[in-house]
C-alpha cells in the first residue's frame, strides 16, 4: 500500500479548498474611485441619507394632507334598510315617493308590513372657515421646509464622513509605506550584522537582535496592511457599496479662513435653519391650540335616491343644501391645557435653538484651536523626523565602522520608525482638523466645491 500517495491525496483536497477560499477573499472586487466620485456615490447610495430623503418626502406629503382639510369632501353611500319600525317604515315610503291613502290608516301606521329600501346618496361638504385647518397648513409647510434643511445638513455630514474616511485611508496608507521602509531597513540591518559576524567583526547575538527587530517590523507591517484594508472597507460601507473602495487621488486641500468667517457662516448652518423653523412652528402650535375657540363654518349639499327593489334605483329622489356653524363652547377645559402645553413646547424649542447656536460657536472655537495645535505638532514632528533620519544615518555609519554596537543602531531605527509614524499621524490630524472646522461652520460643500 502506497502510504505516501495516500497521504498526499488526503492533503490535496483540503489544500485546494483552502486555496480557493483564500483567493476568494484575497481577490474580492475592489472599486477604485476618485474623491469626488466617492462623494457623488455616497450622496446617491448612502442608506442613512436615503432614509432622510424618505423622511423629507413624507413630510412634503404632509402638506397635501393638511391642505385636504380645506378642500371639499365628496361622499358616496349605498345603504340597505329593511324595517317594521312604524316611524322608519312610513318615512321610508315617503322618501320613495309611494305614499298612498291607505298608508294613513292607524292600523297600517302602527303595524306596518316590512319595508325595504336601497338608499343611494351623494353628499358634498366644503369648509368656509376652519382656523385649525389654516394654521395646520402653515405648520405642515414649515415642517416640510425644516425636513429639507435637515436633509441638506445630512448631505453635508455624509460629505464630511467621506472626507474623513478618505483622510484616514491616506494616513493608514502612509503608515503602511512607513512600515515597508522599516522592514526594508531591518532587512538591511540583518544583512550587515550577518556580514560582520561572518567576517569575525561582530557577535552572533547581533544577528539575533537584528532578526528580532526584523520580525517586529514585519508584525507592524501586517497590522498596517490590515488597517488599510479596514479603511477601504469602511469607505465602501459609507458609500453603500459592496467590498473595498480605494481612492486614486488625494482629498482636496481646503482653504483656512479667519475664525470670524466661520462664525458668520455658522449662523446660516442648515440645522440652525431647521431649528429656527421648528421654533417658529412651536409658536404656531399655540395658535393651533387657540383655534379651538373659533367656530367651524361650512356649506354642504346632498342628492338622495330611494328604491324598494334595487341598488342605485330612483323610485324616489330628493336633494338638500345646507349651511352650518359648529362651535365648541365648552370641552372640559381641554383647549386651556392644550394652549398651556403649546406655550411650554415653544419655550423648549427656543431653548434648544439657543443651546444649538452656543454649541456650534464652541465647536468652531475648539476646532480652530485644534487646527493651531495640529499645525504646531505637525511642524514639530517634521523636525523630529529629520533629526531621527540624520541620527540614524550617523549611528549606522559609526556601526559599520565598528564604533557603535548594533543595539545603538536598532534604537536609532526604532526612534526613526516612531518619528515616521508620529509625523504621518500629525499630518492626518491637521488635515482632519481643517475638514472638521469646515463641517462645523456649515460650508464643507462650498469648500469641496460640491453642489448639494
Predicted regions and their residues:
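Small/polar (Gly/Ser/Thr/Ala-rich) solvent-exposed segments
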Residues: 50, 73-88, 110-114, 125-153, ...
